[in-house]
Regions:
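A cytosolic small-molecule/anion-sensing beta-strand core signal
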Residues: 56-57, 73-74, 92
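Ligand-binding loop in jelly-roll beta-barrel domains
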Residues: 82-106
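Short beta-strand segments in beta-sandwich/barrel cores
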Residues: 40-42, 58-63, 77-78
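Short acidic-glycine-tyrosine-enriched beta hairpin
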Residues: 66-82
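A short, N-terminal "cap"/entry segment at the start of jelly-roll beta-barrel domains
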Residues: 1-29, 42, 63, 112-121
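Short histidine-centered beta-strand/loop micro-motifs
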Residues: 21-24, 33, 41-46, 64, ...
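Glycine- and acidic-residue-biased ligand/ion/polar-headgroup-sensing regions
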Residues: 48-61, 65
Length: 121
C-alpha cells in the first residue's frame, strides 16, 4: 500500500495553476491541483477517461459540458464524463485532487500538465 497525505506541502504558484502528480501508473493518475484566487484552467477535456474531482479546500467555479458555471467548495465530488469539456476558476485559494483511469501521459513532466490539451485531465 502507498500512503500519500493530501493536506501537506501544498504549493501555490503566483504565475498560474500548479499540478502535482501524486501517483501515476499504467492504471491511473491522482493529481493535486492548487490555484490562487482568480487563477484559471482553460477549457480542456480528458478524451479517454472520466475525470473525478474532489475539492479539498477553498471555493471555485467549475463548468462542464453544459457550460453552466457552478460554485463548489470543500468536500464536493465532481464527475466529468470522458471527453467532457470543463473549466476552472478559483474564487479563493483552491485545492482539489483529480483522478483519471489509465495514464497515456505518464511520461509527461508535471509542468506540462497545464500547457497542452492532451496532458490535461
Amino acid at each position: 500500500m502507498k500512503f500519500i497525505s493530501l493536506v501537506e506541502n501544498w504549493e501555490f504558484d503566483p504565475k498560474g495553476p500548479h499540478a502535482d502528480p501524486l501517483h501515476v501508473d499504467k492504471n491511473g493518475r491522482a493529481i493535486l491541483f492548487t490555484l490562487e484566487t482568480e487563477q484559471t484552467i482553460r477549457e480542456h477535456n480528458a478524451p479517454s477517461s472520466p475525470f473525478y474531482v474532489v475539492i479539498l479546500a477553498g471555493r471555485g467555479v467549475f463548468a462542464g459540458g453544459d457550460d453552466v458555471e457552478r460554485v463548489v467548495g470543500a468536500n464536493t465530488l465532481l464527475v466529468f464524463e470522458p471527453g467532457e469539456k470543463h473549466t476552472v476558476r478559483a474564487l479563493e485559494n483552491l485545492v482539489f485532487i483529480g483522478f483519471l483511469h489509465g495514464a497515456p501521459g505518464a511520461q509527461i513532466k508535471p509542468s506540462a500538465l497545464l500547457e497542452t490539451d492532451e496532458a490535461l485531465p
